[in-house]
Amino acid sequence: MTEVFTIKQCLDGEISIDETVTVRGWVKTRRDSKAGLSFISLHDGSCFSPIQIVATDQLSNYQKEVTKLTAGCSMIATGKLVASQGKGQFFEIQAESIEVVGWVENPDTYPIQAKRHTLEFLREVAHLRPRTNTISAVTRVRHSLAQAIHRFYHEQGFFWVHTPIITASDCEGAGEMFRVSTLDLLNIPKNDKGQIDFSKDFFGRETFLTVSGQLNVEAYCMAMSKVYTFGPTFRAENSNTSRHLAEFWMIEPEIAFANLEDICKLSQNMLRYLCKTVLEERSDDMDFFNQFVAPGCIERMEHIADSEFEIMTYTDAIKALEASEQKFEFPVSWGLDLQSEHERYLAEVLCKKPVIVTNYPQEIKGFYMRLNDDGKTVAAMDVLAPGIGEIIGGSQREERLEILDRRMDECNLNKEHYQWYRDLRRYGTVPHAGFGLGFERLISYVTGVSNVRDVIPFPRTPGHADY
C-alpha cells in the first residue's frame, strides 16, 4: 500500500522526485484543458499552499467523477510526485488514481466558493470557514503560538496548572460573570428574605464561570514556585467590539519570591520568544498575512523580537502625554486609566517600540495588587505594543493580609468568599507576581487580523452562540 503523506511533506522536499505518494484532502479548484487533462488544487490544512493534482482522461473514473469535482469535495489521490512545469509551484502529483470520498451536494449553494470572502460573511459559516486561506492560516499560527507558550514555560521551569472553570470568586471584582446553575427556572427556590436560595443549587452556593485563573494559580505558586495557567475564561460584558469576546483564552504565569521587575523581564522574554517562533515555524502563513491582510506584520514581529522594551512609570507616561501636541479623544489626567489611543501613542509615536508602564493609581487597578510605599499607586504593569496598545497586564500581588483586607473592604468584596485566598497570606506568605495575556489578542496582533472573532474557532459574543 502506498504511504500517505501530507501536502506539507510533499511541498517541503521531504520526498524524492518520482516517488509514488498518496495524499488526501479537499478540492479548492479544478480546471480542465482541451487536451484531456484536469488540474485539481488540493489542500489538507497541513500548510498554506495546496498541491496540484494532474489527472488525465486515462483514469477510469475521469469522465464520471474527476470532471465533476467542485470546491469542497474530498478525495484521495495516488500518483508520482514530480517537478512542476507550472509557475509558482515546485511540485505536483501526476495522478494514477483518484478516489472521491465526499461530494458537495449542491455546488451552487456551497458557501466557500473560489473567491475572496469577507470575514463578516465567514462568521456566519464558522463551521466551514477553516477551509479558507485566512482562517486556516490563523489556525496554524494559533497552534504554533500555543505550543510555543507551553515550550517557553517548560524550558523556564514552570509547571502548568489546570485551574477550575467553575468558581465562586470574582478575580476582577467587576461582577460581569456568567452564573452556573441547575435551579429550575420555573420554580426558583427563595429564602426568608425573598432572595434566590443558592443553597439548593448544585454546588450549594452561587457559582460562576471563571473570569481568570489567577487567584487559583496563586495557591499553587505558593507551593510550586513557578506556575502558569492556560485555558478558557469568560466575561459577561455586553460589548460588541473587535476587541471583546465572551469566551477567550488566557495565559497567566505566577512566580513566588518575585517582584514587579521580575514579571517585566518575563513578559518581555516571552513576547520576544513567541514572535521569533512564529516567524520561524509559520513563514508561509505570515507571508500571506503580510501580503493580503496586514502589510508590515512581519516587520513588526521582527522589531519586537529584536527590541529592548521601554519601561516607564504611569506618572511619567501621563506627563509625556500631557506634554505632547497630540489631540486625544479622551482626557489625559493623573488618576484616569489610559485609553487605547494613549497606549498606542506611547508605543508607536513616543517610544516606537513596546513599552511597559508601571505603578498605576490603586483606584483603577485590582484589589489584589500590591500597594506601593507612596500609598497611592500599586505595583502594576501593562505591556503596550505598537499597533494594538495593551497586550499584557500584571502586577506584584499584595502579600500582606492586613492591606489585602483593607483593599477588599474598599472594593466591597465579601471576604468570606475569599477565605481560602486570604489563607495564602496567613500561612507562609511570600512576595509573588504574575500577569495575564489574552491569547486571542496576541493572535490578532501577530497576524494583523483585527477582529478577535476571527482568530478563535467559534466566537462567543452577545447574541451569538450558534455552534
Curated annotation (Swiss-Prot):
It is found in: Cytoplasm. Its main location: cytoplasm. InterPro entries: Aa-tRNA-synt_II, aa-tRNA-synth_II, aa-tRNA-synth_II/BPL/LPL, Asn-tRNA-ligase, Asp/Asn-tRNA-synth_IIb, NA-bd_OB-fold, NA-bd_OB_tRNA. One of its GO terms (biological process) is asparaginyl-tRNA aminoacylation. Its EC number is 6.1.1.22. Coiled coil: none annotated. It catalyses: tRNA(Asn) + L-asparagine + ATP = L-asparaginyl-tRNA(Asn) + AMP + diphosphate + H(+). The keyword Ligase applies. Belongs to the class-II aminoacyl-tRNA synthetase family. NCBIfam families: asnS (TIGR00457), PRK03932.1 (NF003037). Homodimer. This is Asparagine--tRNA ligase. The lineage of its organism: Bacteria, Pseudomonadati, Pseudomonadota, Gammaproteobacteria, Legionellales. The gene is asnS.
